[in-house]
Design a protein with these regions (language model features):
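Short helix-boundary/capping micro-motifs
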Residues: 24-42
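Hydrophobic hinge/microswitch elements
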Residues: 149-153, 218-275
Length: 315
């Protein structure tokens, strides 16, 4: 059963934000007893609240067993709505309640871009408080989409270009997400400052073929459409997959490897050893953000977007 339509008519529902918080906590803990302890309520009270919510919504959110609980498919859909409602409630309280004791919260999932990290640093510094809970996830493309769709992240940062745009745009639409372009970039190569091609102003694909092509692993969705690099591994004879930016740059230095990206690189963050060179390739990257459709962004998200625009203004 889907949650859209008559089965999710909640006009006369007594559903509360507290119930939604219970639902999300149980899903995170995967155990009713542990969730009850975390929420400081009794296990029977928590079980009753979850059952009441399931009955109201007409869904079975969890499958119970001696080992704990697991989320059903319709439960995942309900959780996505719950996380978004809780996030919007937090944003509303943050905007209208003059409560300085409220903990600042913000989460963003992104591809491996230095400007995304720099913008995150700006937000933390701007809203520095005695306590806060900020999350930055440099992760795989598919997980970025999942994180934003399921309410784990308020924003996602990724890119589109001619070969992945149709596939990813369909995914955005399916998950009720919208893409907003931040800037356009021409393709560049990241290489070591001591690379044999380091003195070239422009580098061709043919010149790169003797060297290892370094790409970010995409897990189960390891198709060209989810790649962070717009140059297919099929075009290069030597390929190495990595999970993090530090490893990629170490291999670029140690093996004279290369990767392709936007050309935006930060020497303070990545050091002086990695340089950017223009790639002789007719292609344009559209780097932007994804967010849930029709949501109000938190002040932290708005500041983050403004900061990204500042860090990429020279592109």
């Amino acid at each position: 059963r889907g949650l859209v339509g008559s089965e999710m008519c909640i006009r006369d529902s007594a559903m509360t934000l507290q119930q939604l918080k219970y639902l999300v906590t149980v899903a995170e803990c995967k155990n009713i007893t542990e969730a009850a302890e975390k929420l400081f309520i009794s296990q029977p009270s928590l079980s009753a609240a979850i059952h009441n919510l399931e009955n109201e919504m007409g869904v079975t959110a969890f499958v119970r067993s001696n080992k704990g609980v697991s989320v059903t498919r319709e439960g995942e859909e309900l959780l996505s709505f719950a996380r978004n409602l809780l996030e919007q409630a937090d944003i509303m309280k943050d905007r209208f309640c003059n409560d300085k004791s409220r903990m600042p919260k913000f989460s963003v999932s992104c591809q491996h871009y230095s400007f995304a990290v720099n913008a995150f640093v700006d937000v933390v510094n701007k809203y520095d408080a005695n306590i806060y809970s900020f999350i930055l996830r440099e992760t795989q493309t598919g997980e970025i989409i999942d994180d934003v769709a399921n309410g784990r992240s308020e924003l996602g940062i990724l890119y589109l270009f001619e070969h992945n745009e149709d596939v990813l745009t369909k995914l955005f639409k399916k998950n009720d997400l919208v893409f907003e372009e931040i800037f356009k970039a021409s393709p560049h190569v990241f290489i070591s400052k001591n690379h044999p091609l380091a003195n070239n102003d422009i580098i061709t694909l043919e010149e790169l073929k003797p060297y290892p092509y370094l790409v970010y692993e995409q897990g189960k969705r390891n198709s060209f459409y989810f790649s962070e690099e717009f140059l297919s591994v099929l075009d290069m004879p030597k390929n190495i997959q990595v999970r993090d930016r530090a490893t990629l740059f170490n291999l670029a230095i140690g093996l004279n490897g290369f990767t392709v990206s936007s050309g935006v690189i930060d020497k303070e963050l990545n050091g002086e050893d990695i340089i950017s060179k223009k790639l002789d390739m007719d292609c344009t990257m559209r780097i932007g953000l994804i967010k849930k459709k029709n949501i109000i962004l938190s002040r932290y998200a708005i500041s983050y977007i403004d900061s990204i625009k500042k860090h990429t203004a020279i592109v």
